[in-house]
Structures are given as structure tokens and as C-alpha cells.
Amino acid sequence: MAARSAALKIDWVKVTSSLGLRGQTAASLQAFKKRNDDARRKVQILSEQPQTVDFAHYRQILKNQAVVDEIENQFKNFKPATYDVSRQLKAIEAFEAQAVQNAEQTKGKVEAELRNLQKTLENIETARPFDELTVDEVAAAQPEIDEKTASLVSKGRWMPAGYKERFGDMSVV
């Protein structure tokens, strides 16, 4: 009974969104929810149906009393079949373990990204304005600028390709 009340309290949309489930995991969870809802509906319908049979009424109506006696005997001796659900429980536990593992991996990635973004934000906040930087400081921060400049100068080019088209010719001569 506790499992039934716990299952009713699950907010499936919140579970999917708060864990950030996507793709196959979200689809599996939705399929599980659908099976759960279908089973709950069937149990509700069956529990509302009457479960007693008035065999005296059938004895009065039917001429063949042997048939009624046989059916009553089978009804009284009926034992519901029990099913081994351990396989399904193992599958659910494996799904849960996989979902937890995926969530932990995602959590680790998110935390690493947050740390990286925090460092970037600190660098942005503590950085000097661009117009106050020296050429040496820019070259130290981006060594490829020095390499590109050295390459252009060694080829006899004194301006990067497309500079005049973009910024115009600034020469006075």
C-alpha cells in the first residue's frame, strides 16, 4: 500500500526536468510511466467489479445443476497465479543504476563547466581595459599573434591580408 501511495505522489514532469533527462533515458522513463498508468487503471477497474458469484441464483435459472456445481467447485478451488517479478525488479534496478550513473556524469560535467566559467568571469572582471594593454602583454597572452606577425614580415608583408579593404588606406603619402 505504501508503494501505491508513493507512486501516486511522483511528479513525472518534475523528475524529467530536474534531472535533465534527455534522449533514451527520458523515453524509457516515459514508457515506464505509461506502463505504470495502464496497470494502475486496470487494477482500479478490476477492483471496482463485484467479486462474488451468486451460485444459488444460477441453480434456480439453469436446469443443468451439474454445470453449476462444477463451476462453483472450480471457483472455490481457484488460486490466483503468482508471478516471479524479480526479473522485472532487476531490470528496474539496472535502469535506476544507469540513470543515477548518467546523472552523476552530467553533474560532474556541469560542475567542471561552472568552475571554468567562474574562472573566466573572474578574468573578465579583473582584466585591464584593452586600450591600456601593451603590445608585449597582448603577445604574452596570445603567442600566436607574434608567430603570425613574424611569418608575415618574413614574407615581406607589412599588413595582414584584407586590412586595407576593411579599415581603408591610412597612409598619408
Curated annotation (Swiss-Prot):
Keywords: ATP synthesis, CF(0), Hydrogen ion transport, Ion transport, Membrane, Mitochondrion, Mitochondrion inner membrane, Transit peptide, Transport
Broad class of the protein's primary localization: mitochondrion
Subcellular localization(s) per the UniProt record: Mitochondrion inner membrane
A GO cellular-component term linked to this record: mitochondrial inner membrane
Pfam families associated with the record: Mt_ATP-synt_D
PANTHER family attached to this UniProt entry: ATP SYNTHASE SUBUNIT D, MITOCHONDRIAL
Assembly: F-type ATPases have 2 components, CF(1) - the catalytic core - and CF(0) - the membrane proton channel. In yeast, the dimeric form of ATP synthase consists of 17 polypeptides: alpha, beta, gamma, delta, epsilon, 4 (B), 5 (OSCP), 6 (A), 8, 9 (C), d, E (Tim11), f, g, h, i/j and k.
The name this protein goes by in its record: ATP synthase subunit d, mitochondrial
Gene name for this UniProt entry: atp7
